[in-house]
């Protein structure tokens, strides 16, 4: 087998392989000889089939198998001999010649691929980050305890107007400039007035309503609302009040805590505090990652494989266009032209690919492994996110190995981030909840905001829960 490098430019490689016809003939004869005792043909005793007849019957199919084996083995062995790692599966181009299957012509094919870039991992000691730790107000814990206990309260219908603390059942349709927007409608929504469950201004306008009332309210979505096509927008909601219920007197004591499954009020407060700390801890973790990745992004500027870049860009671009379509918006609405957006998202794709390679290299150097138990836990975590569809989701992962493999990357990344956190300078800083949440919605592990606004996501008038890290 003759191996010749025909292209070596940047990360691109092309290798030409020539397997002489005589070598193919030798392999075919060996294959025929090894199988002659195993093949049974009518009219011939086992092992007595003439070689010429056997070749006529099976020669081309055996040769096709041999050619496939040569190509498969060559892809692995050539890369190993050259000490290269292919960024993607090499593209194989075969020169067509019918004589090859008869062993009368050389088998010529080429491998085209991009290598993963080689770069040195730099020291991490110079990286400095701020770890913001939210100081949780006791009032927030008090309010959450009340919400938990109110969920166990009994409610009874009332005839009079609603008051703060009452539970109203409503149908609503949200509109922007008179046009209903996606995700802005719900039937039989239950809302406890004063719970701050919905966006500011929504609940307050339902104080004083009675069952059977129809009302249109006006609200303004917060400027930092996560569905950005609604952020800062004025909207109207057509509301039909279906029921108003008054709760029993809310008691905040050990007996009330026991109704929600905890032994005491003190224990309930501990659980609530832990949940809130975990919630804000996820935000802290996300902002830490952003700082680390920004620092790594500044440290590395190597060439990346075009194939990986195109895949990442196409994934981002498809998601962007899908989000815009769902939101009924255009690039012009976002303050950019499509050409500008392409350029900005390509920069984002470059950042993601480069950071992915850096994190992967760090992980390989320190021996990061993802265990099967960790993958199983990740699968179950995904399943829990779809209540009522557990069987379907589990079947999906069971029948789609690549989906399980995709869960490996974030686990791997978390372990690398933990490794870096132990080696960089981290300064803890106590902040208010408001300070922690400032610009939190703009935080993304591997991106800098490419557009003035992000594209849309599923809309709800309810407040958004914090992101998971």
From Swiss-Prot:
A molecular function (GO) term: ribosome binding
Main enzyme class: isomerase
GO biological-process terms attached to the record: 'de novo' cotranslational protein folding; cell division; chaperone-mediated protein folding; protein transport; protein unfolding
Keyword Zinc: no
GO CC term (a single one): cytoplasm
EC number(s) stated in the UniProt entry for this protein: 5.2.1.8
Biased composition (Basic and acidic residues): 444-460
InterPro entries: PPIase_dom_sf (IPR046357), PPIase_FKBP_dom (IPR001179), Trig_fac (IPR005215), Trigger_fac_C (IPR008880), Trigger_fac_C_sf (IPR037041), Trigger_fac_ribosome-bd_bac (IPR008881), Trigger_fac_ribosome-bd_sf (IPR036611), Trigger_fact/SurA_dom_sf (IPR027304)
Occurrences of domain PPIase FKBP-type (ranges): 165-250
Localization, UniProt: Cytoplasm
Catalytic activity annotation: [protein]-peptidylproline (omega=180) = [protein]-peptidylproline (omega=0)
Spans annotated as Disordered: 444-469
Any single Pfam family the record assigns to this protein: Trigger_N
Keywords from the named record: Cell cycle, Cell division, Chaperone, Cytoplasm, Isomerase, Rotamase
Presence of the UniProt keyword Isomerase in the record: yes
Cited Gene3D superfamilies: 3.10.50.40, Trigger factor ribosome-binding domain (3.30.70.1050), Trigger factor, C-terminal domain (1.10.3120.10)
Family: Belongs to the FKBP-type PPIase family. Tig subfamily.
Function: Involved in protein export. Acts as a chaperone by maintaining the newly synthesized protein in an open conformation. Functions as a peptidyl-prolyl cis-trans isomerase.
NCBIfam families given in the database record: tig
Annotated domain remarks: Consists of 3 domains; the N-terminus binds the ribosome, the middle domain has PPIase activity, while the C-terminus has intrinsic chaperone activity on its own.
Name assigned to this protein: Trigger factor
């Amino acid at each position: 087998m003759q191996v010749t490098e025909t292209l070596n430019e940047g990360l691109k490689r092309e290798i030409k392989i020539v397997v002489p016809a005589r070598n193919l003939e030798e392999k075919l004869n060996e294959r025929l000889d090894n199988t002659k005792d195993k093949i049974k043909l009518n009219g011939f005793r086992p092992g007595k089939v003439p070689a010429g007849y056997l070749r006529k019957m099976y020669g081309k199919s055996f040769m096709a198998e041999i050619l496939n084996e040569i190509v498969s083995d060559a892809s692995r062995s050539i890369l190993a001999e050259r000490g290269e790692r292919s960024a993607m599966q090499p593209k194989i181009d075969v020169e067509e010649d019918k004589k090859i299957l008869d062993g009368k012509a050389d088998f010529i094919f080429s491998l085209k691929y991009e290598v993963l870039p080689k770069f040195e991992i730099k020291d991490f000691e110079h990286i400095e980050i701020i770890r913001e730790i939210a100081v949780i107000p006791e009032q927030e814990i008090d309010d959450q305890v009340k919400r938990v206990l109110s969920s166990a309260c009994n409610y009874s219908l009332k005839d009079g107007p609603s008051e703060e603390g009452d539970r109203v059942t409503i149908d609503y349709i949200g509109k922007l400039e008179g046009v209903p927007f996606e995700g802005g409608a719900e039937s039989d929504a239950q809302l406890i007035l004063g719970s701050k469950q919905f966006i500011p201004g929504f609940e307050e306008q339902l104080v004083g309503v009675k069952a059977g009332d129809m009302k249109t309210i006006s609200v303004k979505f917060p400027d930092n609302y996560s569905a950005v096509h609604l952020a800062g927008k004025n909207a109207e909601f057509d509301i039909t009040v279906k029921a108003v219920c008054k709760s029993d007197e809310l008691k905040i004591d050990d007996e009330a805590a026991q109704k929600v499954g905890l032994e005491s009020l003190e224990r309930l407060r501990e659980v609530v505090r832990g949940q809130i700390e975990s919630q804000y801890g996820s935000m802290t973790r996300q902002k830490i990652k952003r700082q680390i990745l920004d620092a790594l992004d500044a440290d590395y500027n190597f060439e990346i494989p075009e194939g990986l870049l195109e895949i990442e860009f196409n994934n981002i671009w498809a998601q962007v266009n899908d989000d815009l379509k769902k939101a009924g918006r255009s690039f012009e609405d976002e303050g950019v032209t499509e050409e500008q957006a392409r350029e900005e998202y390509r920069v984002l794709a470059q950042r993601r690919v480069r950071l992915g390679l850096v994190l992967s290299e760090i992980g390989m150097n320190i021996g990061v492994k993802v265990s099967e138990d960790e993958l199983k836990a990740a699968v179950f975590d995904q399943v829990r996110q779809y209540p009522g569809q557990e069987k379907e989701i589990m079947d999906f992962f069971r029948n789609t190995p690549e989906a399980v493999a995709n869960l490996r990357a974030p686990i791997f990344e978390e372990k690398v981030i933990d490794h870096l956190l132990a080696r960089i300078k981290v300064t803890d800083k106590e902040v208010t909840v408001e300070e922690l949440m400032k610009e939190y919605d703009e935080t993304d592990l591997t991106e800098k905001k490419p557009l003035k606004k992000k594209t849309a996501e599923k809309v709800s008038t309810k407040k958004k829960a914090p992101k998971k890290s």
